[in-house]
Amino acid sequence: MVSEKCVAAFFLLQLCWAGCGFCSKVLVWPCDMSHWLNLKTILEELGARGHEVTVLKYPSIIIDQSKRIPLHFENIPLLYEIETAENRLNEIANLAVNVIPNLSLWEAAKTLQDFFLQVTGDFESICRSVLYNQKFMDKLRDAQYDVVVIDPVVPCGELVAEVLQIPFVYTLRFSMGYYMEKHCGQLPIPLSYVPVVMSELTDNMTFTERVKNMMFSLLFEYWLQQYDFAFWDQFYSETLGRPTTFCKTVGKADIWLIRTYWDVEFPRPYLPNFEFVGGLHCKPAKPLPKEMEEFVQSSGEHGVVVFSLGSMVKNLTEEKANLIASVLAQIPQKVLWRYSGKKPATLGSNTRLFNWIPQNDLLGHPKTKAFITHGGTNGIYEAIYHGVPMVGVPMLGDQPHNIAHMEAKGAALKVSISTMTSTDLLSAVRAVINEPSYKENAMRLSRIHHDQPVKPLDRAVFWIEFVMRHKGAKHLRVAAHDLSWFQYHSLDVIGFLLLCVVTLTFIITKFCLFVCQKLYMKESKKMGNRKKKN
């Protein structure tokens, strides 16, 4: 007779199989900092559903490897030491805030070019450390992964997938100038009403703004092709042993998970293999730590203002910090400021400094009146989720783009970090808190965000699992990938039709001339005969 323990073990095994449904292996090519915080949410959900998730890790300080996360981390054996992602991001933040505003256009372009060349060198080291390490590649190949989830900020994830012959899924906010989405993913980007990233334009553009939008697009395309993709075209061809391009490899992505949604974006065309999953990391607020809750409650009817420039900018110049502190001291609200620098001399009694704050929980607190933010996508979506109006202090990357969108939708005001005065910042903070329209618009966006048939996180996980179940999603890939640029724009058809029109016009003209000539000759002959008779 079978023992009770054996029966229990049998049923437990059945439950495990039933709970998993199908358990697959996921390889992850991540990016660090705020990108990782977003991607981690997807990976934790995949792990919770029984999938085996392996993250390829290079030197970083943000990627959390604690045991509570159901992920496996595989360290990349680097050929030589590279700068950490945090240091690189702090460097570009310093350039954007403190250096570039004081340079001429030419000097700024040269400074940025030098910086990005250093970053490209770091990325090349990561790529070679993986792709040219046969033992490491064999280890990945033997693991038989079902999909690669890639953040394309760091190149070569798609190259690893190509070498291993594994389908891959992208997760990104955008590429510079939408270059990858447009040229590699074939996503239509009509410049007449789709503002290019970092142009700070809306979908309602004047003629001058459309010219600016076009110039931004051309500038990004020239910059990327000349100083970035040309290098990677050569590297990808060298690695694969055949002529190819970076864009051609990127274009093989099965699904593009875009970290935005129509609450932030303006309406524009998209393709069936592009899925908008903005705000997937957002969640209901949890109770605050006791000391922080007491400080928030002490604000009374005035409420609190949350101030954070994100994980990238921990310190400001002393002058800028004193300016901000003096402004915050003039408002009746209590202020929770995430700041790691020297305590400003002008700091008011209503302001408290923190090395870290539970941002989502604070934004979800009923006493929060406004959010002063750098405009990162994660923070923007947490504010939208909880319906909190914003004062944007953008610096780089997607931040100016995000704040421009929020300002156009009436949920935020923008001030410039490099040129703002105390009057500018104070006016913006007071307006966002005291004018009802900002709160109303923030709540409207919040209702739009919450009113979705399927939650963003569930959509993201569904499409990754879809790719694993079907070994790809090539049926969603448009035929534009197989067309040349002149075929895509139907220039050959237009040329053929123009040739037909010209040919037909030529034939008709010749025929008319021939008829006219015959009639003229006939009339001339009649006139000649009449003259002879006379």
UniProtKB/Swiss-Prot annotation:
Q: What class of enzyme is it?
A: transferase
Is Glycosyltransferase one of the keywords UniProt gives this record? yes
Q: What keywords is this UniProt entry annotated with?
A: Glycoprotein, Glycosyltransferase, Membrane, Signal, Transferase, Transmembrane, Transmembrane helix
Report the EC number(s), separated by commas if there are several. Answer: 2.4.1.17
| Entries under Pfam families matching the protein | UDPGT
Q: Where in the sequence is N6-succinyllysine found? A: 135
Q: Identify its membrane topology class.
A: Single-pass type I membrane protein
Q: Which reaction does it catalyse?
A: glucuronate acceptor + UDP-alpha-D-glucuronate = acceptor beta-D-glucuronoside + UDP + H(+)
Cytoplasmic face of the membrane: 515-534
Signal peptide start and end residues: 1-18
Gene3D superfamilies linked: Glycogen Phosphorylase B
Which cellular component, as a GO term, is one annotated location? membrane
Keyword Glycoprotein among record annotations: yes
Q: For this UniProt entry, what is the primary localization, expressed as one broad class?
A: membrane
**MF term (GO), any:** glucuronosyltransferase activity
Biological role stated in the UniProt entry: UDP-glucuronosyltransferases catalyze phase II biotransformation reactions in which lipophilic substrates are conjugated with glucuronic acid to increase water solubility and enhance excretion. They are of major importance in the conjugation and subsequent elimination of potentially toxic xenobiotics and endogenous compounds.
Q: What is this protein called?
A: UDP-glucuronosyltransferase 2A3
Give the organism the record lists. Mus musculus
